[in-house]
UniProtKB/Swiss-Prot annotation:
Monomer. PROSITE patterns: AA_TRNA_LIGASE_I. ATP binds at K240. GO terms for cellular component: cytosol. It is found in: Cytoplasm. A motif ('HIGH' region) lies at residues 9-19. Its EC number is 6.1.1.17. GO terms for biological process: glutamyl-tRNA aminoacylation. This is Glutamate--tRNA ligase. Keywords: Aminoacyl-tRNA synthetase, ATP-binding, Cytoplasm, Ligase, Metal-binding, Nucleotide-binding, Protein biosynthesis, Zinc.
Amino acid sequence: MKIKTRFAPSPTGYLHVGGARTALYSWLFARHHGGEFVLRIEDTDLERSTPEAIEAIMDGMNWLNLEWDEGPYFQTKRFERYNAVIDEMLEAGTAYKCYCSKERLEQLREEQMAKGEKPRYDGRCRHSYEHHADDEPCVVRFANPQDGSVIFDDQIRGPIEFSNQELDDLIIRRTDGSPTYNFCVVVDDWDMEITHVIRGEDHINNTPRQINILKALNAPVPMYAHVSMINGDDGKKLSKRHGAVSVMQYRDDGYLPEALLNYLVRLGWSSGDQEIFTREEMIKLFSLGAVSKSASAFNTDKLLWLNHHYINTLAPEYVATHLQWHIEQENIDTRNGPQLAELVKLLGERCKTLKEMAQSCRYFYEDFSEFDADAAKKHLRPVARQPLEVVRDKLSAITDWSAENVHHAIQATADELEVGMGKVGMPLRVAVTGAGQSPALDVTVHAIGKTRSIERINKALGFIAERESQQ
């Protein structure tokens, strides 16, 4: 049997991390078994579905590199197929037309609730032989079995049973002729030959209804696996108040897709004590049996740790392709300065996100108008004038511009003046970067470049001279 899974989001908003984890688990299961992964857009909610949401879902899937083998399919383009199946069910007697008014259904609901009963349709039209005009408004309901139970072996949770007496005669076509969500899902899974449905636990109550419809159609019933919800670190359901929940927001915040995928796969699944997984390792090791039944707690600090790990372990050239977007957001012109791959090597240890990296790299490419006030007050004092003049002259004398030779020039300055490296290094750092913090000074000065470094030292000397004149 060829394994076939699907990810079927509703385009009523962005792709959130819960949906992304479900997509990842479905994708991994298909890849692990050499099967196929289908992308299906469940856009039957015409009022809430938007083109922007569809684009956001596609963007998120593409950014995570969760490629699909089929699709994207759109339910709104398959209404003719759904209605044809409903008509066949009406002919076969597994569905019926219901003419009950909204007022009657509301009264029925109130009476049942007053008695402490679960609100459900009482089947009045199921057993009615009243004649109705062809144009009289009606819905179509599925004739759910009235006895027995539905049992399915959830691949994560084990056997789950629902009594058919607890299930309603589900509306499968509205009065306007449009098919309903639960019915469309069934026909899609049947037509697309889905073997395993992996989805959130909020769909558990839909499963027995969908199984009964599949059986009424004599269609194969897929295996089901319901993934537990994701909570915030406070134990409450993950929401915007816990920070970013949109996949693309994590991109915007400077996370690498590898970090988010690694974090999401471990958010409810484990393989021993291993924390770091390549994509290939995920595919090789993933199984539904190792997915937890319990809710998972989202921990942003752990995700940040993973992101820092991947910034420093993935190829700098690859990380640079993602950094480029953030550089563009900061409007930094990188034509005159180090290659972005070199920048990743320079700032990787200091920066936990690519956004932070982009926001702290401007001095490598563009001149700054003023020095950081606190750093200048502390380090660009008259006592720093001589070390800056000497190190400037030694840097100017370098013919082979390298980080090693820059280091020798700084060391030689300290030796000549018989002062510690800090007496030379700190004023030099503020002079060339405008700030009091940077990566190692030799590689920083080397990356900034000879001409630009000397110009900035002269600017710092001018700042010191002006400061002296005011004393």
